[in-house]
Amino acid sequence: MKRSLPLAALAFAAAPAHATLSKGAKAPEFVAQGAEAGKPITFDLKAALKKGPVVLYFFPAAFTPGCNIEAQTFAEAIPKFKAAGATVIGVTAGNTDQLQDFSAKKCAGQFAVAAATDQIKHEYDVDLKKPDGSSTGWTNRTTYVIGKDGKIAMVYSAMKPEEHITNSLAAVEALKS
């Protein structure tokens, strides 16, 4: 946890997020290790898309202030996402050793979180950069809504966590109509 606090401060000073995957692009498929309700899981994007749209939200690190808010707000909104037929998955490269605990405490067991590999960070262009352009090793705060067809329906990058939930829910509900 000692390492988390200086890096959390750095996340707010980091360069703004720039997502290269645009609306209509094919979402890269991936399989990642993670946790749900405190238990280890394997998340497979291709399998999740067979059930419906996926809200894929990247966040800097488990147990940091903004990420706690984002996870708790997504957890509170899960009934609305489920009603729209969507699966929510949080993915991070920060504090991945704490995902089991984070999934139980901050996600309230409502959705899975997974560890971002270097390949996932690269394919989704979510490597959080320092002001000098070097990597922090964490992921930036970017949310993708992926339609059942595997195409990006929405992309939103901003450090303010609450807007990710409202924007992604609106995008998922638009897919339903």
Cite the ranges covered by each PLM segment.
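Structural micro-motif
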Residues: 109-111, 128-131, 137-144
